[in-house]
A protein has these predicted regions:
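N-terminal leader/linker segments that initiate helical-solenoid repeat arrays
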Residues: 18-65, 72, 81
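Canonical tetratricopeptide repeat
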Residues: 61-65, 99, 133-136, 167, ...
Length: 235
């Protein structure tokens, strides 16, 4: 999840003493370089701001932004360190917890990611990203009961969630509940003409998913038709 939270630091400038203006200017330069995708320069200015005012309470945001910039440069261990520093300052900051969980997932540390998603859900019980990703982790662990609980909770919060419905269909398939998986996928595909928010690639994924269920049911001809439709949509 990409969250750059360059925010309240800049909003308080008018009420801060003159020495803090330099801190804000450094933050502003970091924002500018980030928007220009000049990430090494943005990182340099954030580090200068952190060095200038190491006790500034807004440094949680700067460390979080630094982590996101490092992640975009594939410096995953450094990004993790930055998110840890941010959470040392603001341990209940949901966006930062979600960012760290994403890094853990990219590093293959799913158990640690799961802990962060669970903490997020303790703070925000209906957080969609945390529900979706924890359900995915449970499914990888073959804890299908817990995965289903998270998918169903997600769909109560957002009944039209594409990833939630597709995830639940995949879960039903893994449990051998092929007819239920087909029902979910058929419903999503049937709304193709009505739902214009989904891209052709997203619809192609639905046809691929349905082809997988049809293959499990030994309906090879139907699976091939769906795969051809998926290729057509994604071309």
């Amino acid at each position: 999840m990409k969250k750059l939270i360059f925010l309240a630091v800049c909003l308080l400038a008018s009420g801060m003493p003159a020495f803090a203006q330099t801190y804000q200017e450094l933050c502003d330069r970091a924002v500018t370089y980030t928007e220009q995708d000049s990430l090494p320069q943005a990182e340099t200015y954030i580090r200068r701001a952190l060095k200038l005012e190491p006790a500034n309470p807004h440094n949680a945001l700067l460390f979080s932004n630094l982590g996101t910039i490092q992640r975009r440069q594939r410096k995953y261990e450094k990004a993790l360190e930055s998110y840890n520093f941010a959470l040392n300052i603001a341990p209940r900051a949901v966006p930062i917890l979600l960012n760290r969980a994403t890094i853990y997932m990219e590093l293959g540390r799913n158990n640690l990611a799961q802990a962060d998603y669970s903490l997020v859900l303790d703070l925000e019980k209906d957080n969609e990203e945390a529900l979706l990703m924890r359900a995915y982790i449970y499914m990888q662990q073959r804890d299908y009961k817990m995965a289903k609980a998270d998918y169903e909770r997600l769909l109560k919060v957002n009944p039209t969630s594409y990833n939630g419905r597709l995830g639940l269909a995949t879960l039903e398939q893994r449990e051998g509940k092929y007819e239920e998986a087909l029902r979910l996928l058929n419903t999503m595909i049937a709304a193709k003409g009505e739902n214009r928010q989904l891209s052709p690639s997203q619809y192609a994924m639905l046809y691929v998913a349905r082809a997988g269920v049809e293959k499990d049911l030994h309906h090879t001809d139907m699976a091939l038709v769906d795969l051809e439709e998926a290729i057509s949509l994604d071309s």
